[in-house]
């Protein structure tokens, strides 16, 4: 048994990934599969690591003054909307209207 994968880069050049999942001797075939999946994961990590590092460096160079915490919203806007939360734990905080 083997795992196959193919990555097509930005230039359109395909790169094939192949890992054998044979268990040594009469070993458990699922152990062989688990080992193959771990090997494939390592191969994919090695393949994408330079691409990810290049993307991170590109983003840092493009926006050196911005905080790269992943929060795209304005923090001041978040502070202004603290009291606008919905209470799902109980009844509405509004008083019911009394008949007049």
Curated annotation (Swiss-Prot):
InterPro entries: GON7_meta. The keyword rRNA processing does not apply. It is found in: Nucleus. GO terms for cellular component: cytosol; EKC/KEOPS complex; nucleolus; nucleoplasm; nucleus. Transmembrane segments: none annotated. Residues 61-100 are annotated as: Disordered. Keywords: Acetylation, Disease variant, Epilepsy, Intellectual disability, Nucleus. One of its GO terms (biological process) is tRNA threonylcarbamoyladenosine modification. Residues 64-81 have a biased composition (Acidic residues). The modification N-acetylmethionine is found at residue 1. It is linked to Galloway-Mowat syndrome 9: A form of Galloway-Mowat syndrome, a severe renal-neurological disease characterized by early-onset nephrotic syndrome associated with microcephaly, central nervous system abnormalities, developmental delays, and a propensity for seizures. Brain anomalies include gyration defects ranging from lissencephaly to pachygyria and polymicrogyria, and cerebellar hypoplasia. Most patients show facial dysmorphism characterized by a small, narrow forehead, large/floppy ears, deep-set eyes, and micrognathia. Additional variable features are visual impairment and arachnodactyly. Component of the EKC/KEOPS complex that is required for the formation of a threonylcarbamoyl group on adenosine at position 37 (t(6)A37) in tRNAs that read codons beginning with adenine. The complex is probably involved in the transfer of the threonylcarbamoyl moiety of threonylcarbamoyl-AMP (TC-AMP) to the N6 group of A37. GON7 plays a supporting role to the catalytic subunit OSGEP in the complex. Component of the EKC/KEOPS complex composed of at least GON7, TP53RK, TPRKB, OSGEP and LAGE3; the whole complex dimerizes. This is EKC/KEOPS complex subunit GON7. It comes from Homo sapiens. The lineage of its organism: Eukaryota, Metazoa, Chordata, Craniata, Vertebrata.
